[in-house]
């Protein structure tokens, strides 16, 4: 029996809010109507800007939504559903070290972006860590470094505590006890996030 031909990956069709089909090839976005007729083509950055502004009328709308969002990953996923891969776009623009938040504000509203490192350093200058035990402070410090290197969604997921970086503190269940339990650990993460984005006025 001959080998089966490789199965081509099934692409998830992207449909915009007007029900039009969207294809993205080489940074050019093509939008088709229900009959497959090409309606328009635009650059991926213009397409991204239009979609962000369609979703959030103003910069303060977006900041409010970002701060209110329980998990920043849901915002990232809403962009993916529109066919916008923030990570790839940032890499393409030479802005991989910039927070998704800053990148979105920059693309849509022309706001000067901060790098994740700048945001992390602003948190380090504050007295936020001092209310925690030395071990809990060390955990938060590693989480802040994770944010700086990889982004906020990495920090939000409690699975991060299973990584080798945290091995010296024990298993995740033991680590959350350093904060007084899971609820207080999650509250500490929320507070860390609030400090990361503190300079933003909504």
Segments from the language model and where they lie:
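Catalytic cores and motor modules of nucleic-acid processing enzymes
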Residues: 2-202
